Amino acid sequence: SNICTAQALLANMAGFYASYHGAEGLKKIANRILRYRETLKTALKWCGIEVDESEGFDTVRFKGKNTINDFNVRYEDGWTILSLDELTTIEEILLIVHSQYMDIPFEICDMVKRYEWLSFPLRKKPWLQQEVFNKYQSETNMMRYIHELASKDFSLVNGMMPLGSCTMKLNAAAELMPVSWPEFANMHPFVPDDQTLGYQRIIFDLKEWLCDITGFADISLQPNAGSQGEYAGLLAIQKYHQSRGDFKRNVCLIPTSAHGTNPASAVMAGMKIVPVKCDDEGNIDLKDLAVKAIMNTFELSCIMITYPSTHGVFETSIKEICRIVHENGGQVYLDGANMNAQVGLAKPGNYGADVCHL
């Protein structure tokens, strides 16, 4: 569910975007981008500037100045490269041309009607013909459609969700509001560092707070889901062993009560899974753990443990579990799916965990 939640959100956004605009709306947006792109190319060429004709649908590449007022542009081997989208305006195109050639010998507005049209491969068959892409082209209809879909789901709006890892996916309205603010939403991935000081401060503070809460030395905010966090953490453990010359340590102990992503991540990281029994109450069987750890003492890489467990229980033997694994040369990977239950009460780094994802 971790990777699905993180990536399905993007897929849903793309799907609703297509449903709202429909085939004709998307074609209109695409044609506008293409028209403005060709307008810019033609204007630059009329100013005597060399333009690369090989670039694709929305990108213009030309031999020009590497600075354009109020714009960040990519500059590579003497080429200025920029891309247009549905937010591009004719005024912006005028600014770009002005930055390269001050005295434009024509009216840029006239260029929109007289740009050089190039031949592009177009779809020959109808597309987006399904009802869902032709029924919700008004804001009210789209809003009702989204609400209809949401009402089919069970969420905290309806009642309690007993699984901790799902409860954590609640985002309060106060947290969702800033997402749409341009200061957050419109930041380009390749923006210069000196224009991201606010983001850098947020990231720095967040890392410090999370390290303090968990008791760990450092944190990476790169993984986009719990499953990706597991994979990254297990690779870090493997690299740790290898840095010490322990190239044979590839056994991962996993309790039979574990979430399915645990063994999946371990296999992806190249590890061999050794299951550990649980008692009737869902707690890890310490005797079986000790036997498995000793049997694999020279190959033991780590144990993956969820705390509190998937059963919602704080295992009183957590420190003993960590001790057994450490004594046999392994590391303790804590699945932090239920971290909300221990925040402010315990720090994973203090009771023996070596790596954790949140």
Regions found by a protein language model. Give the residues of each.
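Active-site C-terminal subdomain of aminotransferase-like
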Residues: S1-C47, D52-S54, V355-L358
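Conserved phosphate/anionic-ligand binding catalytic regions in large, soluble enzymes, centered on
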Residues: C4-L10, I81, F154-L176, Q222-G233, ...
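Gly-rich Lys/Arg/Thr-decorated short loops/hinges at beta-loop-alpha junctions or inter-strand turns
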Residues: S19-G25, D52-E55, L122-R123, W181-D194, ...
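Conserved PLP-binding catalytic core of the aspartate aminotransferase-like
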Residues: R32, W46-N69, L84-L87
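Conserved N-terminal alpha-helix of the aminotransferase class I/II PLP-enzyme fold
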Residues: R37, S138, F184-N224, G229
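Conserved PLP-enzyme active-site core in the AAT-like
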Residues: L44, N66-I68, G198, Q228-L358
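Short Gly/Ser/Thr- and Asp/Glu-enriched loop/turn motifs at secondary-structure junctions
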Residues: D52-T59, R74-T80, N224, A266
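Flexible inter-domain linker/hinge segments
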Residues: I90-P162, T167-A174, V179-E183
